Amino acid sequence: MKPTSSNGYLLLFRGTNWHRELTSNEVTQIMSEWNQWFERLSNDGKMVAASPLENEGHIVSGKAGAVSDGPFAESKEAIGGFFLLNVPTMEEALEIAKQCPALPQGLTVEVRPVAPMCPANRMASEAKATSLA
């Protein structure tokens, strides 16, 4: 695990149905905690960008660019939103992710370092540099 990323860390929120079994008061309480969490990160200068995602979407795949419906909101793997954080280490990003108010209700948070360059582009650049040497 690479401990630092100068490009930040992405928190991907998965499990878009975490609130379905809760009362409206419980959802209101958790969202109040979520908004306080977000404000604290913003005020501390750690939040670069954030957004929820709509449930509907499409997937484009294959050589022909086939389009299909999905991902499906019912899926535990569906991404419901993201935070882009400006923090120096994976450890700090993980600590922030652990503070997510909806974790106890089944939401999961994937933490990924943002790469400085697409791995395929890096490989192509290195191959080009090697061939010129």
Model-predicted segments: where are they?
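Conserved, structured core segments of small domains
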Residues: 1-133
